[in-house]
Amino acid sequence: MITIKKGLDLPIAGKPAQVIHSGNAVNQVAILGEEYVGMRPSMKVREGDVVKKGQVLFEDKKNPGVIFTAPASGTITAINRGEKRVLQSVVINVEGDEKITFAKYSTEQLNTLSSEQVKQNLIESGLWTALRTRPFSKVPSIESEASSLFVNAMDTNPLAADPSVVLKEYSQDFTNGLTVLSRLFPSKPLHLCKAGDSNIPTTDLENLQIHDFTGVHPAGLVGTHIHFIDPVGIQKTVWHINYQDVIAVGKLFTTGELYSERVISLAGPQVKEPRLVRTIIGVNLSQLTQNELSAGKNRVISGSVLCGQIAKDSHDYLGRYALQVSVIAEGNEKEFFGWIMPQANKYSVTRTVLGHFSKKLFNFTTSENGGERAMVPIGSYERVMPLDILPTLLLRDLIVGDTDGAQELGCLELDEEDLALCSFVCPGKYEYGSILRQVLDKIEKEG
């Protein structure tokens, strides 16, 4: 077992009851284009087209053969684009239940599948996009191979769903999915990472390796798992997938149908009844959260409060890789002498307010409690960074754009979520996730 001691479990109010409920009825879903790093779409549909579940919507020009399929049947009502015609979202009004079917197999056949059979079904169904690479966090090329494949079956993000609760209901589909993924690269390790005290279903596979992690966040991040088990570099790539997509893989291969359901956490200080809800990928979050939130100005986030995406306008949908929806209040009000008050109701990792010594949960808002300033190395980053890197030096190189120095200090192992805690504790209010992405893009472009 690997124990993570450095990190932070955010004491935020609104933790979800770990019981699955049905979510609000919705009639709109979307695929968010900007979730896919470096993707340039070649559209196969236009506004007004009627599509079936599993039908191709667009293909990646930069990654030929990688297709993106509809999570539900209905009518294309909008194709939203931003600056430089960047694809923001493809919106579908859900109608009917027509679907495209794919190859299916009996449970006994799964362990005899060839790598090509697995790859073909994943690509044709669009489930290939559930896989991501490290480094760079991109959908892998269909011609590439990985050093190993990671399945993340734990989640230590604030307000997250407990994977064991979800997997209890889908244990057979999950083990079927593991069997299928083990056939993708039969000679390469399949790493299943789980919490040490969790009851995660497993199966006896030749290349399956099970790893237990325990401790504070980010113990549940795949970047942490990769760092300790099979570190990557410029010449070495691993792939990873989350546990709910493994369920979808299992269902695809045994039913021949694309499975787009999600069980997500709907939680946060502004949610009236924080709980787990059953919905679908790409769901309209305004519809999902209708009558669920406390009065006032709220920020709905697709993903974790630490590193999720703001859900509004053309991005008002559940992300492809998001397993939670977090809601906090907009904190734009000014406080009289806020800088000098004892602040018993505020939390601080640097012990600058009385709230640090309290054991209660806090109603966090979007307020940053200060403006941008110079980076101040006071040891905050080291307290929340469990990886074997020098965070202050790495973050400095990221800020100034020193790609050589950043590579030497381990930036290729990281994704935006791995630096979310550094952003949270940063006295200078830097958003290190977006800075990291700029540096990674530059490294990939320049080689």
UniProtKB/Swiss-Prot annotation:
Protein origin, superkingdom: Bacteria
InterPro entries the record matches: NqrA, NQRA_2nd, NqrA_C_domain, NQRA_N
Keywords on record: Ion transport, NAD, Sodium, Sodium transport, Translocase, Transport, Ubiquinone
Its EC number(s): 7.2.1.1
Gene Ontology terms: biological process: sodium ion transport
GO function terms (MF aspect): oxidoreductase activity, acting on NAD(P)H, quinone or similar compound as acceptor
Pfam families linked to this entry: NQRA_2nd (PF24836), NQRA_N (PF05896), NQRA_SLBB (PF11973)
Reactions catalysed, as given in the entry: a ubiquinone + n Na(+)(in) + NADH + H(+) = a ubiquinol + n Na(+)(out) + NAD(+)
Protein purpose: NQR complex catalyzes the reduction of ubiquinone-1 to ubiquinol by two successive reactions, coupled with the transport of Na(+) ions from the cytoplasm to the periplasm. NqrA to NqrE are probably involved in the second step, the conversion of ubisemiquinone to ubiquinol.
Subunit structure and binding partners: Composed of six subunits; NqrA, NqrB, NqrC, NqrD, NqrE and NqrF.
UniProt similarity note: Belongs to the NqrA family.
Name listed for the protein in its UniProt record: Na(+)-translocating NADH-quinone reductase subunit A
